[in-house]
A protein has these predicted regions:
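Short hydrophobic/aromatic patch on the recognition helix
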Residues: 60, 211-216, 261-262, 266
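A hydrophobic/aromatic-rich effector-binding and dimerization subdomain
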Residues: 2-21, 74-138, 157, 161-166
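Regular secondary-structure segments
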Residues: 42, 127-138, 185, 189-192, ...
Length: 288
């Protein structure tokens, strides 16, 4: 089993190289973050739930996740796999912001296409580049942090150039059941502030509550309630950061009628109370 975990510059960048065999390897349900994510599958297959749909990701596929996008990897029939994962905050590349003004490095993450099927040449280039980053951190030669920054910039420029080529195709739904659950997830995302119950949504889509509960969990990796709460809290985070609305109003706007319940769910997902989260975001803005 390969397990390499690297953190650089106060965790503004982390790199993981993991090979897993046997047993379940579904990632924790609460997963979206302030940084960008690059996920490359070296071996095996995974289901990857992103926002409101599930993709079957295969060997040689690349996944790019923007900031604050809800996502989760899920086991396929065979959970064995090997992958490299990079998570980074844009502040990691801030020292080179002047030198990269001629290109929008992060634009590729803002596309609605998340999963890319790379050809053999692109796979070889990417694998060589990722292992070069890992090797550089292990060696810790003089200037290694600066070099890793430059390697990451080169990687992002490569993505912005290559991933616009028409021959690179998106990986679609694994099967009709996944597509139907994606439709339901999309419905929840668009109507998160309504009184959504499992029973009502199941009835709307002509399913029994038991079937929807079981199948939604299998396909997305989230229970119905987990997904609904994550969508609501994600929207609440935006409102706390971008507006001066009071917390009670925000609670109602995202679908919670009980302020105490809202506070408990918010802290469960973010590890902060709504008030402390707002203070933290305000401090971060002031320090820029």
């Amino acid at each position: 089993m390969i397990l390499i975990m690297i953190a650089i510059d106060n965790k503004l960048l982390t790199i993981e190289h993991v090979s897993r065999e046997g047993g379940s390897h579904t990632m924790p349900a609460k997963h979206y973050h302030e940084g960008y994510e690059i996920y490359y599958l070296l071996e095996g297959e995974r289901y990857y739930f992103i926002e409101d749909r599930t993709y079957r990701v295969r060997k040689g596929n690349l996944v790019l996740i923007n900031k604050n996008i809800l996502h989760r990897t899920i086991d396929t029939e065979n959970p064995d796999h090997e992958r490299i994962l990079i998570e980074f905050h844009e502040n990691f590349l801030k020292p080179y912001s002047k030198e990269t003004k001629d290109i929008s490095l992060y634009s590729i993450f803002k596309q609605k296409q998340f999963v890319y099927k790379l050809n053999v040449e692109e796979q070889l280039w990417l694998e060589n580049h990722l292992f070069k980053m890992i090797k550089e951190k292990k060696s810790k030669n003089k200037g290694y942090v600066s070099y890793i920054r430059l390697l990451l910039i080169e990687l992002l420029i490569y993505f912005n150039r290559q991933l616009k080529i028409d021959s690179i195709s998106i990986v679609e739904y694994p099967d009709p059941t996944h597509e139907k659950m994606a439709e339901i997830a999309s419905f929840i995302s668009k109507n998160y502030n309504s009184d959504l119950s499992l029973k009502n949504v199941a009835s709307l889509f002509n399913y029994s509550s038991t079937y929807l509960s079981r199948t939604f969990k299998q396909v997305t990796g989230f229970s119905f309630v987990e997904y609904k709460n994550n969508i609501r809290i994600k929207e609440a985070r935006k409102l706390l950061q971008q507006t001066d609305l009071n917390i009670s109003d925000i609670s109602s706007m995202v679908g919670y009628n009980n302020l105490t319940h809202f506070g408990r769910i918010f802290k469960e997902i973010t590890n902060y109370s709504p008030l402390n989260f707002r203070k933290l975001m305000s401090m971060k803005r002031s320090s820029k």
